[in-house]
Amino acid sequence: MKLFNARLIVFIGALLLGVGFSVPSLLETKGPKITLGLDLRGGLNMLLGVQTDEALKNKYLSLASALEYNAKKQNILLKDIKSNLEGISFELLDEDEAKKLDALLLELQGHSQFEIKKEAGFYSVNLTPLEQEELRKNTILQVIGIIRNRLDQFGLAEPVVIQQGKEEISVQLPGIKTLEEERRAKDLISRSAHLQMMAVDEEHNKDAMKMTDLEAQKLGSVLLSDVEMGGKILLKAIPILDGEMLTDAKVVYDQNNQPVVSFTLDAQGAKIFGDFSGANVGKRMAIVLDNKVYSAPVIRERIGGGSGQISGNFSVAQASDLAIALRSGAMSAPIQVLEKRIIGPSLGKDSVKTSIIALVGGFILVMGFMVLYYSMAGVIACLALVVNLFLIVAVMAIFGATLTLPGMAGIVLTVGIAVDANIIINERIREVLRENEGIAKAIHLGYINASRAIFDSNITSLIASVLLYAYGTGAIKGFALTTGIGILASIITAIVGTQGIYQALLPKLTQTKSLYFWFGVNKRA
């Protein structure tokens, strides 16, 4: 009999893999590591609601802005262009331009699907219901991507950003320790960073302070807060351009050595910016960020180059965060913090300590029982359990999985599952030995008889783990992940690994005079 057999080689390979990839996580050395969840590490957990209705409004606003700009270029006379949640509406003043208008709408439609209604020169344009639903879904995905991008630029390690429900997003930020870090992270995540250039309604702005939002709406305008001057300012409702055309944003210092955010527009945005400023010298244009006016300077001359600045008495950190938000892209819909929980690092450490005590304590008790009851067979089973634990840690580290408190519970459960497998195998071997059969036959029949039951129970548990991971959330996923990995590891260690060890030891086992030493049982008299 060869000392090294295929099963033993697989077991040794699993041991080396497990130890090799577990070391970085256990000893904090370089290499792939397990990410500790909030409940173990401490940090900030937020549940965000995405207001997808606003994404639809912004879509119609952008469409109205593009329609107004291109209609003027093509000398198509339009009147009363209005935009709301239902779509955009306007009047075509010259019916002879209908074909040109239809061609323009077809061009603006792009890959979207419009519903266009015409009646006596009055038009209404809106997205189809299917297109609206698709827009809402894409908005959630876009917001998730932007949040991840911002957090990466902010320098936060291992943030978790996932969709939860239809229009909600769960954000977990391990390692947030101070109130200042919490505030900055919350502001960075919740800021829409929706940049717009809007014309001041010079005709009616003098009455802005006593005007209501409804009165402004009837004028085709909108009332916004003026950060620079205080009070309200009246702007034309249809923006000149928006942040979709922004290509870069960075912190610079003005002539007073105050931090401001400089932004750059793409070629299309620069052209629109230049055309508008050239045609409106002497009038004011407002720089609007998240529905707040940061400045509304008078246009002195045509502004070329497609760049501008946002100032607002920012600190360096605030200006830096704003630049990050602008660079990562504007959210097409604002978000609202629905729930916020802070888990302190001390609580996380206590959780880790308690979990490790439970795991190690349970492991020692199990090992003690196995050795006392099954003798050397119990020692072999304990070796398989150790390899099982190393494999769980290694696989989670390789894939960058997050270990949570429920995940630790899953590992403890896995120890029990792996022990069950070894108990079944040892009992089947002992049953055959009690029938005065040889050791080689007892081991062979023991594994054959036990494997079927082990596979059946483990496959059932594995299916349950997969379903829990697929349809569960947060804590449930953590539990399902470690349980699933542990089940697969237990199959390798219990069925393949221990059998390989017995095959290697078989020459010695067949010559033994003490079955009790090896299996804790004597042959039947």
Curated annotation (Swiss-Prot):
Family annotation (InterPro entries): Acrflvin-R, SecD, SecD/SecF_arch_bac, SecD_1st, SecD_SecF_C, SecD_SecF_C_bact, SecDF_P1_head
Main location: membrane
Subcellular location: Cell inner membrane
Membrane topology category: Multi-pass membrane protein
SUPFAM superfamilies assigned: Multidrug efflux transporter AcrB transmembrane domain
Pfam families given in the database record: SecD_1st, SecD_SecF_C, SecDF_P1_head
Keywords: Cell inner membrane, Cell membrane, Membrane, Protein transport, Translocation, Transmembrane, Transmembrane helix, Transport
Gene Ontology CC annotations of this record: plasma membrane
Residue stretches spanning the membrane: 8-28, 356-376, 379-399, 405-425, 453-473, 478-498
GO biological process: intracellular protein transmembrane transport; protein targeting; protein transport; protein transport by the Sec complex
Domain of life: Bacteria
Family note: Belongs to the SecD/SecF family. SecD subfamily.
Subunit structure: Forms a complex with SecF. Part of the essential Sec protein translocation apparatus which comprises SecA, SecYEG and auxiliary proteins SecDF-YajC and YidC.
Cited function: Part of the Sec protein translocase complex. Interacts with the SecYEG preprotein conducting channel. SecDF uses the proton motive force (PMF) to complete protein translocation after the ATP-dependent function of SecA.
Name under which the protein is recorded: Protein translocase subunit SecD
Species this chain originates from: Helicobacter pylori (strain ATCC 700392 / 26695) (Campylobacter pylori)
Organismal lineage: Bacteria, Pseudomonadati, Campylobacterota, Epsilonproteobacteria, Campylobacterales
